[in-house]
Every structure is written in C-alpha cells, then in structure tokens.
Amino acid sequence: MSIIKEFKEFAVKGNVMDLAVGVIIGGAFSKIVDSVVKDLIMPVIGVLTGGLDFSNKFVLLGTVPASFKGNPDSFKDLQAAGVAVFGYGSFITVLINFIILAFIIFLMVKFINKLRKPAEAAPAATPEDIVLLREIRDSLKQR
C-alpha cells in the first residue's frame, strides 16, 4: 500500500475529521472566552478591587534604557522596547481564561455523556422453566 493511499485513508476517517472540526470550533470558542474574560469579568474584578487593572500589572526585571520614550508604567510599552518584565497581570488573565474554558468544556462533556447514557434496559423476560414452575405452584395452591 502506498504512502499516499494510507494517508488518504487516515485523513478521511471519522475521528480525524471530527478532530479538525473540534480544533476549528475550539479556536473560535477561545476568542469568545477571551472576550468574556477581558471585557466582562476583568472589569468587574477591577471595580471590586478598587479599579485594579490586571492586564497592566508587572514587575520590572531589567533597567529601562535611557532612550526609552514610552510610558514607564505601561507593560506593553516596556515589553515592546525589549525591557525584561514579569507580566503577572497578563498571567492572571490567562489563568482565569483557562479556568472558565475548562469549566465550560467540563459542563459540555458532562451533558454529552448524559445524552449518551443508554436507556434503562427492560427487565429480562422470565425464563420458561420459571414460568412453568410458577404455573405448577399456582395450580397446587388452588387445590
């Protein structure tokens, strides 16, 4: 069997196609979660913490060059200038993003597994010998 033929069989299998669709939908879904975190959750957390903006929280690890013309309090400006910064605020945002995404995926898997559960099987039919013995018992009771 040639390599091309083997690859073709592999590529058209249901699992590979399902995976491709899942990756595409996951990419689009992660943008939604990013927006929920950045635009909805982080502003609320900022209000609750007194206007704290996590996205711009960092620790300066290097020295700011004398030629730096940006805002020395801006994480993005310092990072763009190549200054070593430890951006823990960005990490907190990504962590919240991950927790939300993991929880939503957990709920989806739980729902799908609930749908996949087979219906309760009907009770097995009583074997003929048991039926016959019951008939004999009932017949003897009537005498």
Swiss-Prot record:
<dbReference type="GO" id="GO:0005886">
    <property type="term" value="C:plasma membrane"/>
</dbReference>
<dbReference type="GO" id="GO:0008381">
    <property type="term" value="F:mechanosensitive monoatomic ion channel activity"/>
</dbReference>
<dbReference type="InterPro" id="IPR036019">
    <property type="entry name" value="MscL_channel"/>
</dbReference>
<comment type="subunit">
    <text>Homopentamer.</text>
</comment>
<dbReference type="InterPro" id="IPR001185">
    <property type="entry name" value="MS_channel"/>
</dbReference>
<keyword id="KW-1133">Transmembrane helix</keyword>
<dbReference type="InterPro" id="IPR019823">
    <property type="entry name" value="Mechanosensitive_channel_CS"/>
</dbReference>
<keyword id="KW-0406">Ion transport</keyword>
<protein>
    <recommendedName>
        <fullName>Large-conductance mechanosensitive channel</fullName>
    </recommendedName>
</protein>
<feature type="transmembrane region" description="Helical">
    <location>
        <begin position="89"/>
        <end position="109"/>
    </location>
</feature>
<dbReference type="InterPro" id="IPR037673">
    <property type="entry name" value="MSC/AndL"/>
</dbReference>
<keyword id="KW-0472">Membrane</keyword>
<keyword id="KW-0997">Cell inner membrane</keyword>
<dbReference type="Pfam" id="PF01741">
    <property type="entry name" value="MscL"/>
</dbReference>
<keyword id="KW-0813">Transport</keyword>
<feature type="transmembrane region" description="Helical">
    <location>
        <begin position="10"/>
        <end position="30"/>
    </location>
</feature>
<comment type="function">
    <text>Channel that opens in response to stretch forces in the membrane lipid bilayer. May participate in the regulation of osmotic pressure changes within the cell.</text>
</comment>
<keyword id="KW-1003">Cell membrane</keyword>
<comment type="similarity">
    <text>Belongs to the MscL family.</text>
</comment>
<keyword id="KW-0812">Transmembrane</keyword>
<keyword id="KW-0407">Ion channel</keyword>
